[in-house]
Amino acid sequence: MEPGAAELYDQALLGILQHVGNVQDFLRVLFGFLYRKTDFYRLLRHPSDRMGFPPGAAQALVLQVFKTFDHMARQDDEKRRQELEEKIRRKEEEEAKTVSAAAAEKEPVPVPVQEIEIDSTTELGGRQEVEKVQPPGPVKEMAHGSLEAEAPGAVAGAAEVPREPPVLPRIQEQFQKNPDSYNGAVRENYTWSQDYTDLEVRVPVPKHVVKGKQVSVALSSSSIRVAMLEENGERVLMEGKLTHKINTESSLWSLEPGKCVLVNLSKVGEYWWNAILEGEEPIDIDKINKERSMATVDEEEQAVLDRLTFDYHQKLQGKPQSHELKVHEMLKKGWDAEGSPFRGQRFDPAMFNISPGAVQF
């Protein structure tokens, strides 16, 4: 499975998890499905067995998958720890810079130096000392000018505060990491995601909104309106014109008490939306996952997938695949037929080399 492909099924799995309410029952559902619908629990005891796993192989497979994601979880823990340490280090550095800048502002300005020039002359037989004192005014002005030139820099240094990261993610890579915005986006008052046939919109509500009668949802083929009922009227949470048509008959909504209004919109056509509402910032649909979910596969496509799965197991065990078995069955019917030159001989499938393209299913 390609990296990120498992996220395709998040919406379906989240629905199961919300229904059963806990991880233990969720795992029971998953393994119960494997028990009822697959050969996961069937053991290969004889060489003639065509389905199942060797003893212990299924358990080893589960353990291997568990260890894979356990390793990823430990890596995530380490990454979070490093990010926290880096955040603390940066905060300490910023605080140190702020303290230094504040201390620089409080340093006393040095007293202007007075320059005294002594001129000695011999006049009338005596020595006369003339003291010329340079007026302190210009010096003071220069000193103040120097201070005024430096002060803005010091204030700017003290005012340098790290910018807060934006509250909402802005790039599609961030949206893809969140199941609620997978193939969609996070907006100010709602979050939306989509697959090949449906869209899911989550509109947050206050914690005290726990009953369906406390909200109002109006859906038409081209618009949506979600409001919360209050004592003095309605408070609109989301309203606008849809960018594409929806099928209102198969669209529905529900309330997750104290969390959000969950609206499932059924697309009229099988194409990807770049926005829910007109005027909304569009997403880049070239950066979303356009693979179809298994939930959207019809019966005919499902039969093909089942056959491919069967062929995969057969190939691993060195046994005939579905196209070979079909030809073997036809050959075996005519092997002992009246007039057949092979009548009475043992039928050996190994005598035939059958290419997959030679068989029509």
From Swiss-Prot:
The keyword Phosphoprotein applies. The keyword Phosphoprotein applies. Residues 87-97 have a biased composition (Basic and acidic residues). Residues 185-277 form the CS domain. GO terms for molecular function: unfolded protein binding. The modification Phosphoserine is found at residues 146, 340, 355. Residues 87-106 are annotated as: Disordered. It holds the Pfam family CS. GO terms for cellular component: cytoplasm; cytoplasmic dynein complex. Keywords: Phosphoprotein. CDD domains: p23_NUDCD3_like (cd06495). GO terms for biological process: cilium assembly; protein folding; protein localization to pericentriolar material. PANTHER family: NUCLEAR MOVEMENT PROTEIN NUDC, NUDC DOMAIN-CONTAINING PROTEIN 3. This is NudC domain-containing protein 3. It comes from Pongo abelii. The gene is NUDCD3.
